[in-house]
């Protein structure tokens, strides 16, 4: 038995990935996929530590609890499938080496599957994007209005998620740097990253940063609605984005932070950035999201081929 799995599972997983781990077709994983798998494994391992379980002892109840964690509740079907495939591959190896007696992921694997047809990602048209950018360039003087437009500018101008906006600190925003940027801190399986601010977002975020520093609010969150400095809820962020989109006449099905993130992604692709580059901007370790949005730039026939091929990324 390889005792390193019991004493240092992080190192054991890294060694196994580098030495022999491979996808279903027995092809070695790409360097990018190895990084993704290591981050996912570490995220799950930390979950087990909190529950008092180990790589050698966890069961289906621990996996079920993982889906109910704050991050897990927001996982898409595709992300859940990636995790189950990773755990199944891991447990089969641990059974083979004598570290485990069973594979609790095996029954989960038959229940999880790639979605047959994922909906086309929602985003603003170029005209709607331009209208929203123009809307952000004329901020009101009141604190609430300035804050709301700064929040919208952060989503549209950096592509961050709602969770990343909630967690952003005042010290993470550098609107006067050359070029201006936002530091997005590490969370879950995502590493820390630096995102350059789109030029249209700089004035409003600079104005909000200066105003926020003068407000008598507890804590150091960049965005908060309360004097005690609590993080903004998803519902409140959704309302703020929906209000701004209503102002420019947007009538799409999902006036949400995710739509603005998708718009940022599509704008970068239209500007000539590769899917690898844009995925890094978004903090993604897989190109799946970018590939789906890139498919919206293609002729219809080619788009269908790309969307149908997307699930193969799980074995990269």
Regions found by a protein language model. Name each.
Residues 282-316:
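Catalytic-site neighborhood detector that most strongly recognizes the C-terminal catalytic loop/helix
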Residues 87, 151-152, 159, 163-168, ...:
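Alpha-helix N-cap/helix-start motif at helix boundaries, enriched for small hydrophobics
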Residues 114-133, 190-199, 216-219:
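DNA breakage-rejoining catalytic core of tyrosine-based enzymes
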Residues 163, 167-203:
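Conserved tyrosine-mediated DNA breakage-rejoining catalytic core shared by Y-recombinases
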Residues 16-119:
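N-terminal core-binding DNA-recognition domain of tyrosine recombinases/integrases
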Residues 141, 241-280, 299:
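Short, basic (Lys/Arg/His-rich) helix/loop patches that form interaction surfaces
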Residues 131-160:
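Basic, Lys/Arg- and aromatic-enriched nucleic-acid-binding interface segment
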Residues 198-252:
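Active-site/catalytic core of tyrosine-dependent DNA strand-transfer enzymes
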């Amino acid at each position: 038995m390889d005792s390193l799995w019991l004493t240092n599972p992080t190192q054991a997983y890294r060694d196994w990935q580098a030495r022999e781990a491979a996808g279903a077709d027995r092809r070695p994983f790409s360097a990018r996929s190895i990084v993704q798998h290591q981050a996912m494994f570490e995220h799950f391992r930390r979950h087990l530590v909190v529950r008092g379980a180990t790589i050698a002892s966890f069961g289906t109840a621990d996996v079920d609890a993982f889906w109910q964690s704050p991050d897990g509740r927001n996982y898409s079907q595709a992300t859940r499938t990636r995790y189950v495939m990773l755990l199944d591959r891991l447990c089969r190896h641990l059974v083979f080496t004598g570290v485990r007696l069973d594979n609790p992921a095996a029954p989960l694997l038959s229940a999880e599957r790639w979605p047959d047809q994922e909906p086309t990602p929602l985003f603003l048209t170029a005209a709607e994007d331009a209208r929203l950018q123009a809307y952000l360039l004329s901020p009101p003087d009141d604190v609430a209005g300035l804050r709301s437009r700064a929040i919208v500018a952060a989503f549209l101008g950096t592509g961050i998620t709602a969770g990343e906006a909630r967690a952003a600190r005042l010290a993470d925003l550098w609107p006067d740097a050359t070029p201006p940027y936002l530091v997005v801190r590490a969370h879950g399986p995502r590493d820390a990253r630096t995102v350059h601010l789109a030029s249209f977002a700089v004035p409003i975020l600079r104005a909000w940063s200066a105003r926020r520093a003068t407000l008598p609010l507890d804590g150091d969150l960049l965005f908060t609605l309360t004097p005690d400095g609590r993080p903004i809820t998803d519902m409140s962020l959704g309302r703020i984005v929906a209000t701004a989109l209503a102002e420019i006449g947007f009538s799409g099905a999902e006036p949400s932070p995710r739509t603005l993130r998708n718009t940022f992604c599509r704008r970068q692709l239209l500007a000539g950035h590769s899917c690898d580059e844009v995925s890094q901007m978004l903090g993604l370790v897989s190109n799946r999201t970018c590939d789906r949005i890139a498919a919206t730039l293609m002729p219809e026939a080619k788009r269908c081929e790309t969307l149908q091929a997307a699930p193969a990324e799980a074995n990269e």
